[in-house]
Amino acid sequence: MNLEFSFGNLIAKNTENSTKEEGTWEVNKLMKFSSEEGRSSSDDYMFSSPDFEKAGNGDAEMREFFNFDGLPDQGLNLPSIAPPSLSHASSPNLSNSQDEAECLPSDRQQDYINPSLHLNRTVFPTPQHSISDANFLANTVDQPLGDNPMFGESDVYLLKMDPMKQAPYEAGFNSVKSSGAIEDPLQFRQPITMLETPFNESINTLTPYAEDYAFSSLNTSAPPLSNKEYAFSVNHLPAINEHKWKSRVETNMLFELRIKSNDNQSVPFEYLRLPSWAHREDKKRSSKPQPLQPDPETVIHLVPTVLAGDKSSVVKTCCTRCLLRERKRNARSQATKDACMPNYTKLKAYERNMTDASPEEKQQFRIKLLNQFPKLEDIDEDRMIMVFTGPEYVRLQLDGNERVAHINARITCYSSHQSCPYFHIIWDLYSMSRLVDRLVFPEPVTVLDDHKSRNLTKSEKTGKSNSQQAPSNHVLSKSNTVPNLVTGFPTRSDNPPNEKRRRTSSSENSRALDIQLSASDSHSPNSKSTLKSVEGSAFSMSKSPSVLSMTTPSGVSPSISKNGFHVVRVPSDAAGFQQRQQQEEGVLEAHTNESAPIAPFPYCTDDFSFSVEEKSSVNNLLTQFDEVAKPDFVSTPIKENVDSSFINMTPPDVSHAPLISRIIPNKGSIMGGYEVTILGANFFNGLVCLFGDNPAAVTFSWSESTIIATCPPATNAGTVPVTFQNYNSSSEAPVMFTYEDNLDNELYKLTVQVLGLKLTGSIQNPLTLSKKLLSSWRDDFAQYITNSIKQPPNSESKGQSKKTLLHDSNMESLKSVISRIVKKDSNQSDDSVESTILAAFALVTDTTTPYLSDFSLVNESGRSLLHLTAACGLSNASTFLCNAGCDVNKRDALGYTPLHYASLYDHKDICVNLLSNGAKPDVIGASGKKPIDLSSSEPIKLVFKEANNEQAQSISRSLIKDSEGSINTNETLESTSIVNEIEESAVQTKSYSESMWNKTVTMFPSLQELPQNYMSEVPSMMQKAMLSTLKSISAIPDDVPPPYSEFADDTTAQAGSSKRDSAISEDPDHHKSVWWSLRWQSRLVGRGKSTALTPEETRAIQEQAKTLKKAGMDFMLFSFWLPALLLLSIFGLRSYAQMIGGYLYRCIIGI
């Protein structure tokens, strides 16, 4: 996009003599400032005119969205910004960054340009001039000079400015200085703003930054460059899959700079020199040699400036996080990685735990991470906000009378890191130290990290670029667009045309429509409207005096069928509309009888809306849309002359039928009970999913396109169609689900888990546990075979003494397993699966471990071993589990008991066995079926009938009958009432005893502590005491090892042997090594437990002993002493009463 456009469409400003407003960028309503949406120069921005900006700045909405802090008042006339400072004391980011909350040290703080410095010094061009108009650029206005106390340290600020840019300003003040207005240039306290520097002035002094431009000498006496001779323009050329005016920090943007002569003469400039502080050589260097010292008069020097989105400050360099990324990218050599990455990885791992650290601590830690990598050598880190790639001197190629240069550049920091939605770019062009032109980019550049976003699809990205290349003809390819089955509107698919997509067997994928959206020009020359986006049923349309019609751009009627349909714009007048309507009537009639449903696209007027008055005429059309997906229509009356016959057309009922496109997973076990996900369209709650003829246990509609169903069990393995109850499948190839018979695998997995629970005490992965058991048993069995071959018969006890009790039990169990399998394999009539399962069950019961056997363990579907053995038809295994105490009425995820599966798979003997062990035949599962309802075998139904009869007979036996055999209701009720009274009296007795105990405990609190303390503490203390007694074991000296150990030799063994040893060795039943082994092992146990009691444990035992002693004393007090005292008191009182009575009697008699 060229910069040669009128400034009246860009900016306007108030001056001292005339009133002008400053134009601002106005964000379109379709614009999204996030990583999920791209930005287009033609679609997403429009530059507002001054008439719309009288109330305030147009960036108010954007500032409110990004929550800017410390911005100037929008009511003020914000000036432009002076060129940025090129000093080295700059910061990597703005200090008010919201994304990082960075608090930088003083040596890396951002130098801001105070917006107040530019008040009353703003000069903007008038609308009739363009940026390439050198005559306008040469016209300047003298600015008021003098001290201003509100600006503070403006002298220091001027000193920090780049002399390359400061020199032209000083040259512009020579006339003022000569008149005596100002004697010292440093007293000027207001920096020069943009677009007001005279371009025809030369620099009179040599700048300190001359080495950056490699000037051998500056020709200060050169004549000034005339601004009317050349015109400069810049254009951003978007690359493939790249949005214009939107980029990433890793992606180079391609810019095209053009220089042309206004008088059609040749341009003398041959090279464009990029800034040396922000330039990096390309990896693939050109083979052509670059000139070392070109003619300075043929070189144009480029100085970039990047402003924040609100134009309140200059962004000089990137933030700390982005600088760390640049350093990491630069440190790609192996030596640098080996030196830097180990420490960086450790610090990065530590940073993840700094969740509660303050922002200052986090920032200091980021700087520490940054210092792990070396600094950039070819780029100045203090001025690297915009980095250029390529040769330092870019050749200006001839293109007729113009010179063209292509420049690759990128912005190294994200917009959000600088607390702004976008950046403004300004390029200053110098020739022979004179400012030739200043190019202000027409639109801001947004730097987003959208390549990590999962919401923005590739098709949306390519759709944006396609809309830019052909804004008047938006075309959606066949492979990239599919219809929305709910609303009838075309929607973009998630995959681009060239991307591999996973195909399904659904019908709608095989009937993908070719949808082409094209836009024709409107009658108004200034009216330009494009279809922004069509996403699902929610869409939006820009304002345009046109309507939508279903026709082709060439006027040929469309084919509204499975082949696709086309949508273009037609005039909104009634005559043009009726003419096109007549062309379409014949086509609509011709396609009425076709099998594919018609998905009508609504006609609408200018604002793509319907009025309230005409709402009744479009009720049939609006019924196609779900209420959640309805767009918000704006009330606009429809023209009366428009024929609404097509609008009132009612779609067929088949369009509302639920459609299934895919099922995940599409296969599973015949036992069912697991959840599957069904994808499609038009789903709602209340649907019943059918797997063949069996309804799903649970069908829950998660959304209009997703259903979660619980797969029902099946009698046989195979493929069944998946449909909905009361809805016929409209597709030729319905979605299929495959049942697999993998009951053996499920049974093996659960059996291995039960075995692992017995051996290890924890539930583990069956595959991992089986590998461990096989490896352990293989090694143990090989060792057992080796020992049995090598050892003589009389040394068997010696070999066994090396094994522990658990090891011996495992060996015995392994031998029993081997013997069982061998015996079962010898009989060909037995089932190998059942024999293996029974051998595993025997291994669980025979193995001696500290852990208990648990045959009631369940898998993820809630099924136990009894469920699986009943389904597999293993009658002996089922009998074993019933005898082992498994719950015969255990329910799984479907609510089925083992009796359900035995009835489903027609295993009569297992049904009889379960019923005899207390299985209930009337249990109802999740599908509302009893075990008898699942069976198709008449013998099994007879078994259930007999069981029901026996249950009825057992119930009838409990009823009291009279002599005639009829039920005596009165006596039965009386017996029942007696039983109830007995139960109630038992409950009352229990509650009374509990209340008495509570009262006793309240009176004597020590009685409550006695049972609890004694029962909980005595066993542990007894164990401690038993372990402590092992310290007193001293069967043999510590320095005498057993004779078979590696520490013993013949002399030690002979010296350590005693008379008792020789006596035992003569006995053939007691081997010498066995006796030594027992003595040594006992001694080892004593040594190992010599420190069993720690001081803390000793103190705890003493405290518990005191508690027990006190509880015992209290018990003796309350159980013996208090009753004895009570009896003595009674006898004493009785004796005292008798004595008093006798005394009184004698007194009375004596009187």
Swiss-Prot record:
It is found in: Vacuole membrane. GO terms for cellular component: cytoplasmic side of endoplasmic reticulum membrane; fungal-type vacuole; nucleus; vacuolar membrane. One of its GO terms (molecular function) is double-stranded DNA binding. It comes from the Eukaryota. ANK repeats lie at residues 861-890, 894-923. The keyword Cell inner membrane does not apply. CDD domains: IPT. Keywords: ANK repeat, Membrane, Repeat, Transmembrane, Transmembrane helix, Vacuole. Residues 452-463, 1058-1067 have a biased composition (Basic and acidic residues). The chain crosses the membrane at residues 1113-1133. Residues 77-104, 452-511, 516-535, 1041-1067 are annotated as: Disordered. Residues 87-98, 464-496, 517-532 have a biased composition (Polar residues). Residues 658-739 form the IPT/TIG domain. One of its GO terms (biological process) is regulation of transcription by RNA polymerase II. Disulfide bonds: none annotated. This is Ankyrin and IPT/TIG repeat-containing protein C26H5.05. It comes from Schizosaccharomyces pombe (strain 972 / ATCC 24843) (Fission yeast). The lineage of its organism: Eukaryota, Fungi, Dikarya, Ascomycota, Taphrinomycotina.
